[in-house]
Amino acid sequence: MAQEIDLSALKELEREAILQVLYRDQAVQNTEEERTRKLKTHLQHLRWKGAKNTDWEHKEKCCARCQQVLGFLLHRGAVCRGCSHRVCAQCRVFLRGTHAWKCTVCFEDRNVKIKTGEWFYEERAKKFPTGGKHETVGGQLLQSYQKLSKISVVPPTPPPVSESQCSRSPGRLQEFGQFRGFNKSVENLFLSLATHVKKLSKSQNDMTSEKHLLATGPRQCVGQTERRSQSDTAVNVTTRKVSAPDILKPLNQEDPKCSTNPILKQQNLPSSPAPSTIFSGGFRHGSLISIDSTCTEMGNFDNANVTGEIEFAIHYCFKTHSLEICIKACKNLAYGEEKKKKCNPYVKTYLLPDRSSQGKRKTGVQRNTVDPTFQETLKYQVAPAQLVTRQLQVSVWHLGTLARRVFLGEVIIPLATWDFEDSTTQSFRWHPLRAKAEKYEDSVPQSNGELTVRAKLVLPSRPRKLQEAQEGTDQPSLHGQLCLVVLGAKNLPVRPDGTLNSFVKGCLTLPDQQKLRLKSPVLRKQACPQWKHSFVFSGVTPAQLRQSSLELTVWDQALFGMNDRLLGGTRLGSKGDTAVGGDACSLSKLQWQKVLSSPNLWTDMTLVLH
């Protein structure tokens, strides 16, 4: 047990100076806890993906991570030594410098322990079982300060006024007495506020901990108990921040999310400034790219009565190919939690049809307000040719307890009809929020880029005498080869850094539902890859190909065993691509028929990815 630190010998101003440092230390700890929470959330998503196995018939024959069906003789998979689950070859991650491997979940769990430092506390608990919970010096000082003070919140005392200064004039003495009375009333106000907030926090944490006990095992309940004990300290620190603005002023200047000077400057600007002043230094540039929106995109969120409007502006720089969405404010939003009259809004954007985590941008969360002010600029790197195929989705969400999301409304803007060169379209506008549509109507054919390929049906030639002898008789079709050369792709949805680790998958589906799959090598860090890779499908006849379909998909290889991102795909065959309109479907049929009708000749095609 650590020894308690005695602060009774310090003066009031010295305590406040120490308290300022403790608040900064607490802010650093909160940032570290947020980083740890994101790592554990990503690990939990991987575990949930492996748990979503509804195919009970093939329960013992599927990979425990990606649910891919395993074979009896080939591709049987292997058992992970960490979790004792059978996984396929694609769900294994080899450790650096060794031949040992782990599954994606065990490897991610190992990385989380390394990055968060949990391995150190586990080893310490083995050597010192009665060591207790880790406690920093800053936490000990905060506890000593709380026990020393009679009230939970102590505002900073003003500079001392000498009696000689007060005795010079009776007005000074009267003013000094009123100032002391005002300080006393402020102390009483923050005392009642801190006590009330602390009671609400304890009751809310007790309710969430009871729900968590029913849903999780005993191992996770221990972590929830520790988190609940930390929440009381967080509430006390938050109330102190409100009560001592002078102390926390240097801390707010260090944190860009808490800075208010740019906002005050921007409010003095006219309502419709010129485009050159809209995207100036008055806004925080950049955005947050997180990994915890998988549940919301799958429909796992709550809905509120959509009300209110959002104000933003759109600007595109043709030199840097940068699309900037400047989110200014919202008004008259609905409450995310109607019973508690609570709303913690934030804004999230996508460039449809890309809904991946790399294509998401979002602002910071504004607490307890239905009229938030964001003043943030979200950026995308998009080529001008891709703007006509994109739609900007701007949605507003409420962040509740336990990371629960509530949908508050959205705005869909087709960029094909947006005039980026007109100065009036670059000024701020209010857009009414609408409910989430079940299916977005595409005003323009959406495209994820273009894929250039060459195809040829290779058939063996017959001798002339045998061909003349078999004319007019029913003869079996010759087995040939379908050769496909994947040349390259362009206008693909790239990552935030402007690169891709792309590869192509080809799948030929025969009439008997047999599937022939091939894959190209990965080209790393190229926005416009040029593979020039050949796919050869052997043992097929022209009669089979007339009733078959060829599906080509372009993927972006993920890192650290995560799921690869689908960039787009297209389909050639008798049925065409059913995911697009009638014109594109008929075009794919004509291209497929042209390949089959001209054997032993190359046919160049440019396919649009959807």
UniProtKB/Swiss-Prot annotation:
Record-linked Gene3D superfamilies: C2 domain, Zinc/RING finger domain, C3HC4 (zinc finger)
Membrane topology: Peripheral membrane protein
Region of interest called Disordered, as start-end residue ranges on this chain: 219-239
Pfam families linked to this entry: C2, FYVE_2
Molecular function terms from GO: calcium-dependent phospholipid binding; neurexin family protein binding; small GTPase binding
GO cellular component terms listed in the entry, alphabetical order: exocytic vesicle; plasma membrane
Keyword field: Membrane, Repeat
Highest taxon, organism lineage: Eukaryota
InterPro entries, per the entry: C2_dom, C2_domain_sf, FYVE_2, Rab_BD, SYTL1-5_C2B, Znf_FYVE_PHD, Znf_RING/FYVE/PHD
Gene Ontology BP terms: exocytosis; intracellular protein transport
Compartment annotation: Endomembrane system
Subunit field text: Monomer. Binds NRXN1. Binds RAB27A that has been activated by GTP-binding via its N-terminus.
Function of the molecule: May act as Rab effector protein and play a role in vesicle trafficking. Binds phospholipids in the presence of calcium ions.
Record PANTHER family: BITESIZE, ISOFORM I (PTHR45716:SF2)
Protein's name in the database: Synaptotagmin-like protein 3
